[in-house]
Curated annotation (Swiss-Prot):
Role this protein plays: This protein promotes the GTP-dependent binding of aminoacyl-tRNA to the A-site of ribosomes during protein biosynthesis.
Region (G1): 14-21
Gene Ontology MF terms: GTP binding; GTPase activity; translation elongation factor activity
CDD domains (alphabetical): EF1_alpha (cd01883), EF1_alpha_II (cd03693), EF1_alpha_III (cd03705)
Annotated stretches, region: G4: 153-156
GO CC terms: cytoplasm
Protein name in UniProt: Elongation factor 1-alpha, somatic form
GO BP: any one term: translational elongation
Subcellular location: Cytoplasm
Organism annotation: Xenopus laevis (African clawed frog)
Length: 462
């Protein structure tokens, strides 16, 4: 086997009919975790339903349907391999909770792949003022996904097919608007593809002899190639934040007979190991970690990205819950947030939002109502420049700096210190009405919380 390949996460974005599913399906189909038997089964079903033209999107439809119904599908289905990486597709839009998932995302995407359709009129629809292309790209950038690849899809349906002129026109247009958002087009690979026919997906296309390949220049090293797969190989691997203090938002807390209380969650920053004394915020409970395990194997330490369960001493299941955050009691322990200042972008709200609005915030694993206490300034959502002080209202499309107060104790962090704990989705009327990143947190001075005996003992022996 040799050394395992690095894992990277991508998010696939673009307008509803750009061909995201077909393109993603193609990659999973050709390089991924779907076994031949499943594919044959899908093909047979497709033929019976008269969807013989199914090709790849069908694969994704099947997987999506299973995901939507909450069937835990074998997650390998959303993985594929390049020569350098194991790639996981964290989410593909079209999924109901896509925006929420992208923000509270169980994991941060390392790169966004933007698919735009080159067909006559299609590109224009996707990029128009109300097309989703812009919104997705803006979201990705706001949420800290700084690497981008653009797949110019459906090259087989341009007039004439595989038109170089059309490709160049689109590259020019897309470059202009991703630049406005904040991406540097020199660092972005633009690849003309057909997710359906496979042009430039895994192998160079004989249909576009004019295409001399894509090039990117960046300080971390430049790259060039012809296919989408090669562009994925050029993604810079993430540096996992092991050197930061520990932050581990809890997803669940279990009571396991003979073992005791076992909180479960994903390490976002830092490391957790047996013997460490951890503090849970906002409940302010401090105790010793007895053991850490992942997939039923004991670990000497868990690092960012690991989903772990850890056993804690003298803490009852009633003391800690989902949405709490564990951290190292001796190294910038997490604390309750009294209030925080955030930059929010209103995505789709039918009316106006004024001070006093109190929707639910989804931030890491916490789900808590927060009040928009003060609208401080309205800003230009691309440049961040101030447009007006103390606006009375905000409406869809606006960006603003807002002071927020949690309705119940909550632990959040500024995006610059701990990115996964510093971005949130604002939910109201069963949809995501806004997204935000936290600029600053006013932490509550912790009173004397519960410190278990084992924590006191551990402190003495150190």
């Amino acid at each position: 086997m040799g050394k395992e390949k690095t894992h990277i996460n991508i998010v696939v974005i673009g307008h509803v009919d750009s061909g995201k599913s077909t393109t993603t399906g193609h990659l999973i189909y050709k390089c991924g975790g779907i076994d031949k038997r499943t594919i044959e089964k899908f093909e047979k079903e497709a033929a019976e339903m008269g969807k013989g033209s199914f090709k790849y999107a069908w694969v994704l439809d099947k997987l999506k349907a299973e995901r939507e119904r909450g069937i835990t599908i074998d997650i390998s289905l959303w993985k594929f391999e390049t020569s350098k990486y194991y790639v996981t597709i964290i989410d593909a839009p079209g999924h109901r909770d896509f925006i929420k998932n992208m923000i509270t995302g169980t994991s941060q995407a390392d790169c966004a792949v933007l698919i735009v359709a080159a067909g006559v009129g299609e590109f224009e629809a996707g990029i128009s003022k109300n097309g989703q292309t812009r919104e997705h790209a803006l979201l990705a950038y706001t949420l800290g996904v700084k690497q981008l690849i653009v797949g110019i899809n459906k090259m087989d349906s341009t007039e004439p097919p595989y038109s170089q002129k059309r490709y160049e026109e689109i590259v020019k247009e897309v470059s202009t608007y991703i630049k406005k958002i904040g991406y540097n087009p020199d660092t972005v690979a633009f690849v003309p593809i057909s997710g359906w026919n496979g042009d430039n997906m895994l192998e160079p296309s004989p249909n576009m002899p004019w295409f001399k390949g894509w090039k990117i220049t960046r300080k971390e090293g430049s790259g060039s190639g012809t296919t989408l797969l090669e562009a994925l190989d050029c993604i810079l691997p993430p540096s996992r934040p092991t050197d930061k203090p520990l932050r581990l938002p809890l997803q669940d807390v279990y009571k396991i007979g003979g073992i005791g209380t076992v909180p479960v969650g994903r390490v976002e920053t830092g490391v957790i190991k047996p013997g460490m004394v951890v503090t849970f915020a906002p409940v302010n409970v401090t105790t010793e970690v007895k053991s850490v395990e992942m997939h039923h194997e004991a670990l000497t330490e868990a690092v960012p990205g690991d989903n772990v369960g850890f056993n804690v001493k003298n803490v009852s299941v009633k003391d800690v819950r989902r949405g709490n955050v564990a951290g190292d009691s001796k190294n910038d322990p997490p604390m309750e947030a009294g209030s925080f200042t955030a930059q929010v972008i209103i995505l789709n709200h039918p009316g106006q939002i004024g001070a006093g609005y109190a929707p639910v915030l989804d931030c890491h694993t916490a789900h808590i109502a927060c009040k928009f206490a003060e609208l401080k300034e309205k800003i230009d959502r691309r440049s961040g420049k101030k447009l007006e002080d103390n606006p009375k209202f905000l409406k869809s499309g606006d960006a603003a700096i807002v002071d927020m107060i949690p309705g119940k104790p909550m632990c959040v962090e500024s995006f610059s210190d701990y990115p996964p704990l510093g971005r949130f989705a604002v939910r109201d009327m069963r949809q995501t009405v806004a997204v935000g990143v936290i600029k600053a947190v006013e932490k509550k001075a912790a009173g004397s919380g519960k410190v278990t005996k084992s924590a006191q003992k551990a402190a003495k022996t150190k």
